[in-house]
């Protein structure tokens, strides 16, 4: 395999600078400018799963459905990297498409499984791709590298209500055809 992933790890002052710049953009209402399109909405079974995830997560955080301020604070926590001490950004060359992104996805899954096996908590975050220019500037990344996502990581705090969230998975017979 061609190992198409590009990996950038930020800790300390660098992570804080990236976090602060992202939070500032969110607070200023700067539109997201992801390198890749993401669906505005989901329909059918995907929407059902999205809503179930939100209900579970926000429920654990004590945020009611109509609490727009609470939801906004929870959304902002993404850009604050959930106070994790480190974040890894994953990118790939813009010339590559979905078939190569599959390799990158396998790398990301292996990275997260390895972190977990070593007692390190991690949270994959699509929101870390919303302001890719901040990441490119921080690491002096060429413009042809697109940022796919970030993974905040560190030792998990079990007292944080969001960390108690468990999202049910569909039964295998609903996802796999035999």
What residues fall within each predicted segment?
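Acidic, surface-exposed loops and disordered segments
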Residues: 1-178
